[in-house]
């Protein structure tokens, strides 16, 4: 008999619905008018979810979310700019690495891996250094599941007259974001996260005026957001071969997103998943790494068992054999592992995951207390 698909307790790729997977069974011509209409409808809905209005445009891009992050930074940030990067995890550090490779001056503002970025500290940093032109913020630092206070930081940037670029890779669709009201200049996310599509397409939702001012700025051909946008405006087509099946799956996923009730309903389901998971894991003896006030309902980091019998590869394999896929830890300060709460999942799947983890502890002889 064929193996049953495992349930992915990861922050993307994630478990998708049958309707989303079925959408990939059709082939599309990349220059066909029907596919162009598909692209246009997806982009319009993404701007709507972000609360962007007419002042913002969506630029899709082939590749993972990091491709879109690098494309956005490389296109929107001038080479003589100076960027403040609040850093409390691996994905914040990745932004700094991209800026370094692009040759763009930047300043990292460090926070602990369990500490949300402080709007007050960001305000003070901007006040100290008038050369800072941009802030590049990770909304939800997936390495721990840490939520940074986007609205407060956006208010600081707006008051200080600094541009704000937001990596919303793991928050877009699950948490409320209002681009126009917040004054955010660009938001970046991807198809295979909280929208519950499949991986393969990133996108940036950008203030139209900022994008139109960025012509010729990108050092890359493939990652030039302005050129991608301008070409789509002229032709309705992608510059290079588009991920046709990924886009079709995202269209189906967006239809389900709206049918569910949009961001409020999606966020509420993830919150129920998270609460079910944390309660069940605590009953087994596990503790979350983050304080509940900083915890996002997308992915939870748990301290690893202290028992010497614990080793993540064997633990992972035992849980995988029961039909669930965990995520390794990504912290520098503690031995941890992560469990995602997103995807086409509900509380029943979270209870099943807890049971599988409990079974793994028993089969491997790992004591929790």
Curated annotation (Swiss-Prot):
GO molecular function: 2-aminoethylphosphonate-pyruvate transaminase activity
Function according to Swiss-Prot or TrEMBL: Involved in phosphonate degradation.
A Pfam family annotated for this UniProt entry: Aminotran_5
UniProt catalytic activity: (2-aminoethyl)phosphonate + pyruvate = phosphonoacetaldehyde + L-alanine
Protein name: 2-aminoethylphosphonate--pyruvate transaminase
Protein family according to the UniProt entry: Belongs to the class-V pyridoxal-phosphate-dependent aminotransferase family. PhnW subfamily.
The protein's required cofactors: pyridoxal 5'-phosphate
Quaternary organization: Homodimer.
EC number: 2.6.1.37
HAMAP family: PhnW_aminotrans_5 (MF_01376)
Keyword Hydrolase carried by entry: no
Record gene name: phnW
Any single GO BP term: organic phosphonate catabolic process
Keyword field: Aminotransferase, Pyridoxal phosphate, Pyruvate, Transferase
N6-(pyridoxal phosphate)lysine carried by residues: 193
